């Protein structure tokens, strides 16, 4: 496993450093070409695919199997393999967590399944997280914690990228397969780093729809984003979401909105220039995280966000407007009949 990616990705917009790093890597990989008579078989993984100037230009005898459907199961664990080879471990985990066998299987699937490397392929479980879960007999964000994606966050902020769009993006095979240091599109980097995967495919136009593969990646990545976008430090960040959820569950909407407002304090000039996108990104992060513990429907359009948030006992219908008053937002809720679907619901409506 040759992880060349990090130094190059951390200097993605420094062309001089990119050239230096490529010139270091090319002779390293070139040895595989000159010594191919002594190598019967080699499998290279963890290698980033860059466009224009490749570190493999001297190594033309490689076969790229990244999106070859014959090899989709080569670097992960299938559900069938879990039940064939790891059945005892599943039952031991269920016992340790006081869960049924069925509940344990569903939780494993939710947390660690979902990787698709070509269209219409079988879902693959993350082997690192899966095996660590069995070894420790407890669920955890094992893969995510091996490397925090600071360079991806900097790339997203550098390109002023819409996080909602990132989590629901559409692209083609050429974009997925090559990272261009001159491009402002962060999606190929995020995809090749394992934080996005193929969710759907349109064969007519050759378009892939991407998304987060599973809960470990989605919650870990979005939670990691919070202190980079909102006015909250990294230590307090996990507790802020916990407080959010409690306030929502108990109907303490005054505290909820005060906490939300505090996230926008001390906004920098750079952020003010991209104010609408910044607000949308913070809302996306907050309600994405709250949505792991409550039911959230989130829609965004030019200058406004519609939100329905449901708990066991309460329903919140919200309208956020960038340029407008609270009265106008409330009038929009009334005029558009946003609360109508809940008219016969027994829960308290805000």
Locate the predicted segments by residue.
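A short beta-strand-to-loop transition that corresponds to the Sensor-1 phosphate-sensing loop
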Residues: 1, 27, 35-52, 56-60, ...
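Short, small-residue-biased leader/transition segments that mark boundaries at the very start
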Residues: 2-6
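Conserved ATPase-coupling elements of RecA-like P-loop NTPase cores
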Residues: 7-21
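Switch/connector loops and helix/strand junctions flanking conserved nucleotide-binding motifs
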Residues: 7-10, 51-57, 326-329
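Substrate-engagement module of ASCE P-loop NTPases
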Residues: 18-40, 338-341
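Amphipathic alpha-helical segments of the small helical/lid subdomains adjacent to P-loop NTPase cores
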Residues: 51-58, 65-132
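Extended alpha-helical interface modules used as scaffolds for assembling large macromolecular complexes
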Residues: 62, 123-328, 335-337
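Nucleic-acid nuclease catalytic cores
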Residues: 326, 330, 339-350
């Amino acid at each position: 496993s040759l992880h060349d990616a990090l130094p190059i990705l951390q200097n993605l917009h420094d062309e001089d450093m990119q050239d230096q790093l490529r010139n270091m890597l090319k002779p390293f990989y070139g040895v595989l070409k000159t010594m191919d008579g002594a190598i019967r078989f080699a499998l290279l993984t963890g290698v980033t695919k860059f466009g224009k100037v490749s570190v493999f230009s001297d190594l033309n005898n490689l076969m790229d199997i990244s999106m070859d459907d014959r090899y989709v199961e080569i670097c992960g664990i299938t559900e069938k393999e879990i039940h064939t080879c790891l059945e005892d471990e599943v039952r031991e985990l269920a016992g340790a967590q006081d869960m049924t066998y069925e509940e344990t299987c569903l939780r494993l699937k939710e947390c660690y399944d979902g990787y698709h490397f070509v269209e219409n392929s079988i879902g693959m479980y993350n082997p690192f997280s899966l095996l660590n879960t069995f070894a420790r007999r407890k669920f955890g964000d094992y893969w995510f914690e091996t490397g925090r994606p600071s360079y991806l966050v900097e790339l997203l902020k550098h390109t002023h990228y819409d996080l909602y769009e990132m989590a629901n993006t559409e692209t083609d095979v050429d974009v997925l397969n090559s990272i261009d240091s001159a491009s402002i599109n962060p999606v190929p980097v995020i995809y090749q780093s394992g934080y996005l995967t193929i969710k759907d495919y349109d064969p007519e136009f050759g378009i892939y729809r991407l998304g987060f593969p599973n809960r470990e990646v989605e919650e870990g990545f979005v939670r990691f984003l919070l202190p980079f976008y909102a006015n909250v430090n990294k230590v307090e960040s996990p507790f802020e979401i916990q407080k959010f959820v409690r306030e929502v569950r108990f109907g303490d909407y005054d505290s909820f909105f005060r906490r939300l407002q505090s996230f926008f304090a001390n906004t920098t000039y750079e952020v003010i220039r991209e104010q609408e996108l910044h607000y949308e990104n913070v809302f996306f992060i907050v309600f994405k995280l709250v949505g792991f513990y409550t039911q959230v429907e989130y829609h965004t359009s030019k200058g406004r966000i519609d939100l329905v948030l449901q708990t066991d006992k309460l329903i919140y219908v919200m309208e956020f407007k960038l340029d407008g008053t609270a009265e106008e937002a409330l009038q929009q809720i009334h005029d558009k009949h946003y609360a109508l679907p809940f008219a016969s619901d027994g829960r308290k409506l805000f």
